[in-house]
Amino acid sequence: MRLIMLGTGMAMVTKCYNTCFVLADDAGSFMVDGGGGNGIFRQAEAAGVKIAEIRDFFLTHKHTDHILGMIWVLRMVTERLHAGWVTGEYRFYGHEEVIRLLKSFAEGLFKPALLKQMEENVRFITVEDGETRRIMGRNVTFFDIGSVKAKQFGFTMELEAGGKERLTCCGDEPLKACGQQYAEGARWLLHEAFCEDAQEAFFHAHEYFHSTVKEACETAERLGVKNLVLYHSEDVFLEERKRRYLAEGRQFFSGGLYVPDDLEVIELI
């Protein structure tokens, strides 16, 4: 299985794309969030990802740097269906609020022909906290991350039958106590890191309910995570970001540490 980082930035970046990614293997692909606009098409094309071939999509929450790109994804899917270039079912997962918003945007913006395709070929699947679904032939359990800004879900995916090896994504906020059961001992944890610890006062990471590299790494170390991927970061120091984040993070996390750039691919298993 591969992790394809389509974007690695926080909301207001200009030198990279907003955080979103695809999990892919021979069984299929699973796309998580869409970033903030139709730049998702450019990122996908550059990464060799064919969006219309993905059948399962997950939207973590309603913030613009996550949901607006997914509206474009939904438009592409319905356009391809209408043109007859693809057939079959597409599935969009999320909690009740984001599913309602995604459908509302489409109903208010799409032309009737696309809405007809949406009604016939797109399933909007509302998931609850702790609910498990089969995606890519694997068990995926969605969970409420406990955000106080906007309702947000993360997920944990079995990498091997029985759940002994897992990948956990805790959205774009620090992992809280309510989600630790899903991350403890995980083979992979995807966790936001807004900036270096020394730069917190400049970037106001805590004010925006985000972590520093040091804090994310301390959390992963405490939970016995094997590999940690840091994303949803500033781009002011983009050219040096990987080097600087790795230098800070390795002081606090003893496992495999990854600070991907946009379009980077990480082999998970």
Task: List PLM regions with ranges.
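Active-site-proximal loop/helix segment associated with metal-binding centers of metalloenzymes
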Residues: V13-K15, T126-A198
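Divalent metal-coordination and catalytic microenvironments
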Residues: L3, D33, A44, H61, ...
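Metallo-beta-lactamase
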Residues: V86-K151, E160, Y258, D262
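Cap/insert and terminal regions of metallo-dependent hydrolase folds
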Residues: P174-L263
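Active-site metal-binding motif and surrounding structural segment of the metallo-beta-lactamase
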Residues: N38-Y90
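Short histidine/acidic/glycine/proline-rich micro-motifs that form metal-
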Residues: A11, F92, V98-I99, S233-L238
